[in-house]
Amino acid sequence: MTAVTTGPRTASPGTGAGSSGAGSRRSGAAPPRVDLVLAPTPLHPAPRLSRELGVPVLFKRDDLTGAGLGGNKLRGLEFLVADALAQGCDSLVTGAGPQSNWTMLAALTCLRYGIEPHVVCYGSAGTGRAEGNLRLHRWLGVDVRFTGEAERSSVDAGIEAVTGELRAAGRHPYPVPRGGATPLGALGYVRASLELAAQLAGLDEPPAGLWLATGSCGTQAGLVAGAAVTGASYQVVGVTVSRPAEEAAGRVRELAAAAATLAGTDPDLPAPDVRTGWIGPGYGTPSAAGQAAARLVAQTEGVFLDPVFGAKAMAALIAECRAGRVHGPQVFLVSGGAPTLFAGDLCTGSEAS
């Protein structure tokens, strides 16, 4: 792996020896949580888009969670960072793509709590000017390393390698998988489901569906578990933007069951609904349908959707509405990702450099 930049160290070594990572917590006492999200995030109708589609659409604005430029990943980080602190960890190692909103918010949160962040990205550093989230990582002085391989799975070995380096140096790292997709991380959206239930109680008609983009699967898993916990009648519909639908559904099912157990419940969970056909040219690359959907939302509601996740999920919802296959109010999770709007040509439909 190639080190892109190693910033100033702001964290002091922790006093505890725990460094098992995000998958190590056992059920029992309620998991600790740090307060990151400015909750509740708004739930509001999208009237002009609704008229365009002939279906009532509401936006759940998790692009307005608070830290940085907002985003859904803060919800899982409330539990993951709290667990790292409880284990006495002095550093956190995670990874994803070079334009990852997950790693950006993880790094910001770590810095706030005196934990040193380390980020592993697939691909190569390149020689051009950093843009979007990568530029923010560099500006913050975060240690970012590239695997030199195009496969996203190369990040997993990179996280393990950096974690090993830190342990060998006497540090106490907290490794977290890509996207924070662990049962503990999924608890963030179990909690969000309680928040959403209170907001939906004031509506005249309950929603029939809750739509979102699905990548690492933790957000959908938390929402599936949360819907079961709250007794919600809506269907949680994930639109995969990366992995095959069958693989995504399996991950959602496994994470949702484990998150429900951590939450102290054992509800009957429905089979995950994961839609496919909207990835376009590939993960991290805009699609024509996604860009058209994002432009429509911006022009009708003044809301920007990121090209990697939100735009593709909205394209699926729009297509289903126009085909007459969607009935009743639909909630769309706006999950953030604003920095990717300023990364290369992501917003115009060409692959970012």
Kindly give the residue locations of the regions a language model identified.
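PLP-dependent amino-acid enzyme catalytic core
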Residues: M1-S353
